[in-house]
């Protein structure tokens, strides 16, 4: 219901983009009965623009539509180029960048590049190019590791460490996947998707006792959330 509701304001548009990404990433698919909402991001910042293009890329990936995915990559690259012109050598947005809340920053430019690498990895997957997929994912995690953690709504909707971890699991490389999920959890403690990925990696490594401990964390955290919501 929340995804289908939004007023014409920058805050609600930003929230809608975040929620749509969260729905698709956490579930692993987009519900057929739910219509994806198009959002006019012209007055929003690079974070929201990155997230919107990433969401569209996920939908294109699900449909195995490489052409549509490439268009999203091209679109975000254009936004990155425009934003780069508004940040000076010190990494500070110039006056012409608009409202401070949505003005681009040097950090934001780097995080956008992370998202582009993630999208390129998905495109490589569709084309069956495993070496290029891994190259893009490795580059994404390297760059994300150089960035600060977002205390509020995440700039990077699908942490590249988790995306890489999920891909490594699919390649039957659980030990390497575990490293990526642990990296994601190092600054996103109790993130459900990362914990589930960690469980899958541990079980693939026959480390069942450790997997049970992680599963207990999910149960405890979920219970705490239910109590808080009452």
Question: Which residue ranges define each predicted feature?
Answer:
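Start-of-helix signal in alpha-solenoid helical-repeat scaffolds, especially tetratricopeptide repeats
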Residues: 14, 48-50, 107-114, 158, ...
